[in-house]
A protein has these predicted regions:
Chain C
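Extracytosolic ligand-binding ectodomains
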Residues: 2-16, 20-392
């Protein structure tokens, strides 16, 4: 039981990264029907921006003795803000000119923008891997044989908070309503006075901001940043986003958690060498049984690439 | 591209032609048939073979510039004029002279050839082409390696184009198919011909290897085709985005499976293959793949894949068996990816599951979408251009990975379906004589 | 228009004349050495270290006026090419350097994934190649022209297993390694073999793995902690080491951790911090308290590039020095590249007791070095302290 609970908590942390990144994917995917293959690299850029901001804040406030959690919150907010500009820029350069093109072409542009982000990152920061500053002192609690660190609690709490915030934004605000409308039909909705040229950058901005938050939390939990860290995570979050189903943003978050749970628990139950094999077989089976993801609606003709 | 953009481009192009007088200079090229180009290159290659070294020496080049001077240009910019002069003297001059003075005669010859049955003259052209390639590549082993890998890239690009271009799915499993082919083909040749620590003594003498190599490749291809069923069967009920992640999951599964199979060497990879994939073998397989894939996409089932792409429901209503179409197309494309994988393994004489990862996938995507969807010529252009550019820009190290993506993005913005998309590939038209009215 | 083309033509011909003057001085005898490094791709840090080390070496040579062969000095040119950390690019690059640039010997590629196919190329063209970092036995096996600079897994794995047995007397061990990467995998296997030979079947109580680029090891570590192992063996690269060790500590692991030569980088401490203090690992040299040429090398490198060199740098340096020694031992530099390569290969195989930065070494007939390993303990100040030396 302890063993199970310990892994449950591990999976909660790991799943929240997938969920946060998948949310960003799903924003773009559900509303604009684009694969944003650059998303993993936006996540990476977010982590690096977070690193710069955090270092700056530590340098500024270090003498004053500001508490770590304050620096962390400030870092997250500022980096989310800055990274959202990267998202907007990518939308403007890479996706807007391709709005009438086949969706696969946009996916390729995304892939290429991702490579550019990685390369320019190496050009700026060098090939060295970077240690993310530990903003919060790690405290380990031992509750009945289960080890929980304060970082784990912070990470899960912040990601749940962000998810709830996004849900509120999408469901309750005017902008959110415009986005939902856009996801129904982006030919008719612009005629109703909602400009696609406003909604699309906004979607990218929010998605990138979430990726930046994920990047900083990732830096807290796994404090080694490297320029290629976004690739595999991005592709896996892509799996989660689509597993959640088109048109369902919270579905993506749930699928992200599910992916985390599948990975952790297959490693727990089976020999861990077989983890990828079994985890992805499960996903293959899920998709064979439920071909439109968990919450997606079946409208296959509009899913053409 | 939007029509108005296209119009401006076209007009500019026309203006340019008039201003610079391209028409006057290059007009006679348009009267040259395919045979003329071959003759032109043949003479260029013969010149290079005979006196290439002397010309290079005269121009102050250390050696003959192997890949049209691309390699030395970026490393030693001082040599650029020399390399350019070399290209002009050795390649452009013979071509121009052939076009200027022999067009008529060659056209007559081409017309004579054209009267023969198409298979006969096609084979003649291919043999001629191979002779040129062989002489050209024979001058440097670096050319041979680059050519072999380029040819393999052509097969890969074509086979992915069948799924992504002709059928309109977004399949991410191609490296998985390639890995299956590479591993199965290598296993066969290793069991049969190599004294190896994984499979023990060789069963057959190694002089038989070149003859049985095609069988090994076909086994690899069939293995990949069978593997593709795992992707093809879920594709009955879903498509587009969901199929993309099914195929992605398939790729991860194959990679993880190979890593766990200790029999195949696991992550350590499998080495010791005989270098069976020499230039003629790779060339023949490439031509075969172009021929068969072209036949496939122009056949009834090929047209059916197009129908499935454009509207699956309508296709179904028109009595197209969409399930059969999907299965056959997937298996067919996977077969060729497997063959390419097998060739790849025997060029490198080593395979490793890490080679068949996301990076390779991105590379194949780039080639397909650069060249053009739904087009055989496009795929060939995409593969050749990417491989050449990749070699040429290598000295730039990091900046290569900024330049290539930027080019790719520009292509996607101005020609969203690729350079030469939606073109039919008609060998008869290409080989037809020109100019005679 | 006409003026422009006139100017262009003029520029063209001037440049042409400049470059053509090449053949006046072009046919000088130059010793060319190829460096096949992963400058872009998955492991850019390795490529950068290789390049930096090679440049430092070249500086030395240039200061000395070239490599001296039979009393005459010849200039040296490095041909540095990028293999993108891909097997096919490594093959292309090796072919290019050997057939086009006519290098006398190739240094690199570093990781086995590229070194095995590239070694095949070098061997078929009878060109000596030294891979500084590749630990896979297949790299040099049955290839008389291919050498390597590092020791092999079959030596390092058992050595670590024996070290723990002698030093601590533990009987239960756990291993966590990357199943998709051949260096950790090979080492993990040999360690397991040796450990089970020492302590009986099933004494490796937990044998867990992950895949390259994973960042979360909590599930595997939970398993390891619950298995009751007394020591954890992590044969990983330093970026993964930092994550694994930190997470292990967070999950309550307080027992010793054991590493391999890939830990031997200053970045281990930068990334891992105090969590790694007290861990042991085997390596080629201990940077704290190094003596003689090793210290000299570390200091110079640090001064030039402002970071402490890691094992890649040290091994590349030794490989370059080995190549230099083999070239210097030539009876004459004939300019006939085939003959020279053959002789260099012969000299390389005959090198005995070469005094390198990573210890003294000689080559076995297979082209693998025989050299001692050092066990290092990470002190509480974060320094690599010499603990014990083990020789084969």
């Amino acid at each position: 039981m302890e063993y199970f609970l310990q892994n449950f908590i591990n999976a909660l942390q790991w799943g929240s990264f997938y969920a946060l990144i998948a949310l960003g994917y799903s924003m773009v995917y559900s509303i604009l029907m684009l694969f944003n293959f650059a998303h993993g690299d936006i996540f990476m850029s977010g982590a690096y921006i977070g690193f710069c901001i955090a270092s700056l804040f530590i340098f500024l406030f270090g003498g004053v003795g500001a508490p770590g959690w304050l620096v962390m919150i400030l870092t997250i907010i500022v980096s989310m803000f800055l990274t959202s500009f990267i998202g907007v820029l990518i939308e403007k350069i890479g996706y807007r000119p391709l709005r009438n093109a086949p969706r696969a072409s946009a996916a390729i542009t995304g892939l290429m923008i991702g490579i550019i982000l990685e390369t320019s990152n190496i050009a700026i920061f060098g090939t060295k891997r970077i240690a993310f500053p530990p903003l919060v002192e790690t405290v380990t609690y031992n509750i009945a044989g289960i080890f929980i660190t304060n970082k784990k609690i912070i990470i899960v709490a912040i990601s749940l908070f962000l998810m709830a915030g996004l849900h509120f934004f999408i469901e309750k605000t005017k902008w959110g309503m415009a986005m939902r409308a856009m996801s129904y039909d982006f030919f008719i909705v612009p005629l109703m006075g909602v400009s696609l040229n406003v909604i699309a950058p906004l979607t990218f901005a929010i998605g990138s901001a979430l990726a930046a938050a994920a990047g900083i939390l990732y830096g807290l939990a796994y404090p080694v940043l490297d320029p290629y860290m976004g690739i595999l995570l991005g592709w896996k979050a892509f799996v989660a986003a689509i597993l959640g189903g088109r048109g369902s943003i919270l579905g993506a978050a749930l699928a992200g958690f599910l992916l985390g749970f599948i990975e952790i628990f297959t490693a727990m139950i089976f020999p861990s060498t077989l983890r990828d094999l079994i985890a992805y077989s499960i996903i293959l089976i899920i998709l064979t049984i439920r071909p439109h993801g968990f919450f997606g609606k079946a409208h296959s003709s509009s899913l053409r690439l | 591209m939007q029509p108005r953009y296209f119009a401006t481009f076209y007009l500019n192009y026309k203006n340019m032609k008039r201003i610079i007088g391209f028409k006057k200079i290059l007009g006679f090229f348009s009267a040259m048939p395919a045979l003329g180009w071959l003759f032109g290159f043949f003479s260029a290659v013969i010149i290079e073979y005979l006196i290439g070294n002397n010309i290079a020496w005269l121009l102050g080049l250390p050696k003959i510039p192997v890949l049209f001077g691309f390699l030395i240009m970026l490393k030693k910019p001082l040599l650029i004029p020399g390399a350019l002069a070399y290209i002009i003297i050795v390649y452009l001059l013979p071509l121009t002279l052939t076009a200027r003075f022999f067009s008529g005669k060659i056209n007559k010859l081409a017309a004579k050839l054209y009267k023969l049955p198409p298979p006969v003259y096609t084979v003649f052209y291919l043999i001629f082409l191979y002779i040129i390639i062989d002489i050209w590549a024979g001058m440097s082993d670096y050319r041979i390696v680059t050519l072999k890998l380029t040819f393999i890239a052509i097969i890969l690009t074509l086979s992915l184009n069948v799924i992504n271009g002709y059928m309109g799915e977004f399949s991410c499993s191609h490296t998985g198919f390639m890995a299956l082919g590479a591993y199965f083909a290598s296993t066969v040749t290793l069991i049969l011909f190599t004294n190896d620590k994984l499979f023990g003594e060789a069963l057959l003498p190694s002089y038989l290897a070149p003859f049985l190599f095609p069988i090994a490749l076909i086994i690899g291809g069939i293995a990949a085709a069978l593997g593709s069923l795992l992707v093809a069967i879920p594709s009955f009920r879903t498509r587009g985005d969901y199929l993309a992640i099914i195929s992605l999951a398939f790729m991860f599964i194959v990679k993880s499976l190979i890593e766990n199979l200790e029999v195949l060497g696991g992550a350590r990879g499998m080495g010791g293959q005989h270098p069976l994939a020499n230039l003629p073998t790779v060339f023949i397989w490439t031509i075969l793949s172009i021929w068969i894939i072209n036949n496939f996409v122009t056949s009834i089932i090929g047209k059916a894949t197009n129908a499935v792409r454009d509207n699956e429901t309508a296709a179904n209503a028109m009595t197209i068996n969409t399930r059969r179409t999907k299965i056959v197309t997937f298996m067919f494309a996977a077969f060729w990816a497997g063959v390419a994988g097998g060739l790849f393994a025997h060029v490198l004489c080593y395979v490793n599951p890490g080679t068949f990862g996301i990076k390779k996938l991105a590379e194949i995507f780039t080639m397909v979408y650069f060249g053009g969807l739904n087009s055989i010529v496009g795929s060939i252009i995409g593969a050749v251009a990417f491989n050449l550019a990749s070699e040429a820009l290598r000295p730039l190290e990091l900046f290569k990975w900024i330049i290539i993506p930027v080019i790719m993005i520009l292509i996607m913005i101005y020609r969203p379906t690729g350079l030469v998309a939606f073109k039919e590939f008609d060998i008869k038209k290409i080989l037809a004589p020109k100019g005679d009215k | 228009m006409k003026k422009l083309s006139l100017i262009l033509t003029a520029i063209f011909f001037t440049l042409f004349a400049l470059s053509s003057s090449g053949w006046c001085w072009g046919k000088k005898k130059i010793i060319k050495i190829g460096i096949n490094a992963p400058i872009t791709g998955d492991i850019p840090k390795v490529g950068e270290n290789t390049k930096n080390t090679a440049k430092m070496w070249l500086e030395d040579i240039e200061k000395a006026g070239g490599i001296e062969i039979a009393g005459k000095k010849y200039p040296v040119e490095l041909v540095i090419e990028d293999n993108e950390a891909q097997a096919e690019s490594a093959v292309k690059v090796n072919t290019k350097m050997i057939t086009e640039d006519e290098v006398i010997t190739v240094i690199g590629p570093q990781s086995s994934k590229q070194a095995i196919p590239a070694g095949g190329v070098a061997d078929s063209y009878a060109t000596p190649m030294i891979s500084p970092w590749s630990t896979n036995p297949d790299t040099t096996k049955d290839r008389p022209y291919v050498f390597r600079g590092c020791f092999l897994d079959p030596f390092q794995g058992p050595m670590l297993a024996n070290f723990v047995k002698e030093e601590f007397g533990f009987t239960k061990a756990a291993v966590l390694y990357d199943v998709a990467s051949d260096y950790p995998k090979g080492l993990a296997e040999y360690f397991k073999q040796a450990w089970e030979k020492n302590n009986g079947e099933g004494s490796v109580v937990s044998y867990e793995s992950f895949t390259t680029k994973d960042a979360d090891f909590s599930s595997q570590l939970t398993k390891i902690i619950n298995s009751g192992a007394e020591v954890l063996f992590v044969p990983q690269y330093y970026n993964e080491v930092a994550l694994i060790v930190k997470q292990a500590r967070e999950l309550g692991w307080k027992k010793p951790i054991l590493g391999s030569d890939s830990w031997g980088s200053s970045e281990t401490i930068t990334l891992c911090g105090s969590d790694c203090y007290g861990a042991f690992f085997s390596t080629h040299y201990a940077s704290a308290g190094a003596e003689g040429i090793t210290k000299e090398f570390i200091d110079r490198y640090k001064k030039k590039y402002s970071y402490v060199p890691d094992d890649v740098c040290a091994l590349t340096w030794d490989s370059l020095k080995l190549a230099q020694k083999a070239i210097e031992a030539l009876v004459e530099f004939s300019g006939d590249i085939k003959k020279d390569r053959e002789n260099v290969k012969k000299n390389l195989a005959e090198i005995a007791n070469f005094e390198g930065v990573t210890g003294n070494m000689s080559f076995t007939p297979d082209g693998d070095p025989v050299k001692c390993a050092i066990i290092v303990k990470i002190s509480d100040a974060g320094e690599f302290r010499f603990y014990k030396s083990v020789c084969p």
